C-alpha cells in the first residue's frame, strides 16, 4: 500500500487476520488507516442543548444520521469537520474543549455510542456498567434513563475509577454510583437484580487502528486468545446479576471472532437462561451499515479430550449457529468510523430474581445479619439539619441529599431507595438489611451540588447549578448581559456598583448567590459571591461559554 499513512499496515498480522475474517477485505484496509473524524455526543439532559447544537453547526459540525437526536433516549452524535485531535482553529478548539469540560458534550467515537443505543434503557431502570472507565458509555447510560433510576458504574483500577468520578461530575448526572471492584467478583446487588447490563469488555482494540495506529505493529493472532477467558468471566458474572426479563449487551472494539462470537457461543453454552435476541439496530441506529455475526472462522485451539469443546473454534451446536447472526458487526469502511461488535442478550429464566440472588435455602434466606459499620469518609444520607438548611435558605425541597466532607450531593431517588436502602444477599445465602453500601466499595454517588464550610451551607456548586438553578427560590437575582460582560472582562464590581445594576441585591446577605440571565433562548445560571465586591464563581469552561454567548473574545 504505497503512500500509506501507517507503512506497516499492509504487512501486519492484523491485515492477514482480517483477510481470513471477510472476503472483501481490501476496502477495510483502505478505510482502517486514515485518522477518525472528531465526533461528539450532545448531552440531552442539559436545558441549553439547542444552543450547544447551534454552536456545533456554526463550527461546521453535522449530526450523524444514525445517531440522531432522541433515538433510543440518547443524545445526538455529531461529526466535526476535522480529524480527531487535529483541529487547526484555536477558537474552535477552545469552544469544543469548553463544551466538553462543562458536560454539554462528550468526546466519544461514533461507534462507541452504539452499545447503549441497542441496550434499550428506559427511565427508572437499574443499570450496571461492569467495565465503565473512562465513563463515556456510563454517562450515556445516565442520559438514556433520563437521569431517573440508577447506573452502577464499576471499574477495578483505582486511577481509572477516579477518572470515572471526574467524568460523572463533568456530565452533571445524579443517577450514577461509581464502584471499584474486579468485575469478575462484583458483589450481589439488591433484588431483583439489574434491568439492564452493559459489558464493554477489555479487548485487543484491533478495530481502533484509526485512533490507535500502534495496533498495526502490536497486534498478534494470539492477542484475542489471551483475553478470551477474562471476557467470558466478566460476561458470565454480569449475566448472573441480570433480572429475569432484563437485557444485557456484550461489546468490544475488536474485529476478532475469538473475542466476539466465540465468547457469545461459550456464554450461551454456560448460561442456559440467556437468549441472543434481535438488537433492532436498523430501528435504533437508522442508516448504520452492519453485518451479521460470524458463524465460521479459522481457529487453532488445542483440544485434548474427546468430549472437550474448543472455546476458540466455531460452534457445532445448531441452536448456537442459528443464533450468532443476531450479533452486530460494524466495519470501519462501511460507515467511515471505527469498528465494533455488539451482542444483545435477554434473561429468559423462569426464576423471580437474578440467578446470583437466588438463595441457597429458605433457612439461609431468612438469616438476617446486622449491617457492618460504614467505612470512614463514606457518603451517607444528609442530616435533617442540612436538608432543612437547603429548604429554608435556598427554597429547594424534594431532593435526595447525601453528605461527605464539605459537600452535599444530589442523588436520584433510586440510588437511595434501592441501592442504599435495599436488602442484599451475602455470598453464603444470608441477607443484610439495607441502610449502607456494603458489600460494595462505593467511590462516589450522585452529583456534588452544595458546598459547605464548618458544617454550614455555603452555595450551590458550579457543577450542580444546571440542575439546581430552576429549583432555587431564594438568593437568585436577574442580571443583565452588560453587567456580566463587564465582570468577565474587568472583574467584579464593588457591591455598591452592582446594586445600582441589580437593585434586588439591596439587603442581600453576604455569601453565595446565583445570577440569572436570559440570552439567546437559553437561561444562564451563574454562581456568584457577595462580599465587598460581586464576584463570579465560575470555572474556566463556564466562563468561556458565557463569554461566547455574550459575544466576547476572552483569553483561552
Where are these regions (language model features)?
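Class I S-adenosyl-L-methionine
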Residues: 194, 247, 255-408
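S-adenosyl-L-methionine
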Residues: 154-191
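Short beta-strand element of Class I
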Residues: 148-152
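Polybasic, low-complexity RNA-engagement segments
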Residues: 1-61, 321, 336-341, 346-556
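Mobile active-site "lid"/loop adjacent to the S-adenosyl-L-methionine
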Residues: 159, 192-237, 242-245, 249, ...
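Conserved SAM-dependent methyltransferase scaffold
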Residues: 138-142
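Class I SAM-dependent transferase core
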Residues: 71-121
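Conserved class I S-adenosyl-L-methionine
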Residues: 124-133
